[in-house]
Design a protein with these regions (language model features):
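Short substrate-entry loop that stabilizes the transition state in hydrolases
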Residues: 31-35, 40-77, 154-155, 180-185
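Alpha/beta-hydrolase-fold catalytic nucleophile elbow
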Residues: 69, 115, 145-149, 174, ...
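Cap/lid segment of the alpha/beta-hydrolase catalytic domain
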Residues: 45, 49-52, 57, 70-89, ...
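N-terminal cap/lid segment of alpha/beta-hydrolase-fold proteins
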Residues: 1-33
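Primarily recognizes the serine-hydrolase "nucleophile elbow" in alpha/beta-hydrolase
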Residues: 89-166
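Short beta-strand/loop motif that positions the catalytic acidic residue
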Residues: 167, 173-175
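C-terminal catalytic histidine-bearing segment of alpha/beta-hydrolase fold enzymes
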Residues: 202-268
Length: 268
């Protein structure tokens, strides 16, 4: 495993009045000039050990990672009452992070992916649509997407959560069997099966058994009250760490991004 250097940086969002977003950049010290990179988007509660766990395995596979603190830049404390009102308004953060990485000398601008968790997973899915991507990039898009438990019940049911007409890039969608935002392990399968064939073939779905929301967040063992829980009925949602499933998700992430950001380039 190569050593990794840590850098604390500031990312400028692409809002009309840009936000200055604190972020942690990790760069593998493996002697290579340019690396693929993955942006890791936190959930409603803000930055956590979860993102660092994924960064560890991606760095070990030779990828740069960038973890932002999107809430502090807005003076928000996190949670259902302390997050932005809409996910759409945070897309300027994500594309600002992409611009930051594309300009970084250690990064190959053509090989940038994104993984997001919960709220961040929703942003990841939005960025995969041609509609939202075109609002920031006239040419190009992220090379790979990995949304993790992004409340799949919301898609194509509420305004601004339209999912379809996807950019030409692979997606690994990870959900939890016991996630109480969806309240049905078939929800994610129904979403994917309802897409056009062109979009369906871009998506690999993994439903993690015995897994609640936040199954990959070390130390999570709590109940939260969220109006988006229980398919929009609101109420209590269990968040519980499952170390075995977390380890499996890390392995899936490393394999997915390596295949699509590292190995794919080697084959071309």
């Amino acid at each position: 495993m190569p050593d990794t250097s840590f850098h604390y940086v500031t990312v400028r969002s692409l809002h009309e009045a840009p936000l200055a977003i604190a972020a942690r950049l990790r760069v593998p010290q493996d002697g290579l000039a340019h690396h693929p990179a993955v942006i890791l988007l936190h959930g409603s509660s803000g930055p956590s050990l979860r993102e660092g766990g994924y960064a560890d395995v991606l760095n070990a596979a030779g990828m740069v990672t960038l973890e932002m603190d999107q809430w502090s830049a807005r003076g928000l404390g996190g949670g259902a009452e302390g997050r932005p009102k809409t996910v759409v308004e945070t897309l300027a953060d994500l594309y600002g992070a992409r611009a930051f990485l594309a300009a970084h000398p250690a990064v190959d601008a053509a090989r940038i992916g994104v993984a997001g968790f919960s709220f961040g997973g929703v942003a990841t899915m939005l960025a995969a649509t041609r509609r939202h991507n075109a609002g920031f990039l006239k040419n190009g898009h992220f090379r790979a997407f990995m949304p993790v438990y992004p409340a799949t019940w919301t898609w194509n049911r509420i305004p601004n959560f339209e999912f379809g007409d996807l950019v030409d890039a692979p997606m690994l969608l990870i959900t939890g069997e016991n996630d109480q935002y969806d309240n049905d392990p078939e929800t994610s399968r129904k979403l994917v099966s309802g897409l056009s064939l062109d979009d369906r073939v871009k998506i690999t779905l993994k439903v993690m058994p015995n897994s609640h929301h936040g199954f990959d967040m070390p130390g999570a063992d709590m109940v939260v009250n969220d109006p988006f829980g229980n398919q929009g009925k609101g109420g209590l949602v269990i968040m519980r760490y499952n170390p075995e499933m977390s380890q499996q998700a890390h392995k899936l992430a490393a394999e997915f991004f390596k295949a699509n950001l590292v190995d794919e380039v080697m084959r071309t």
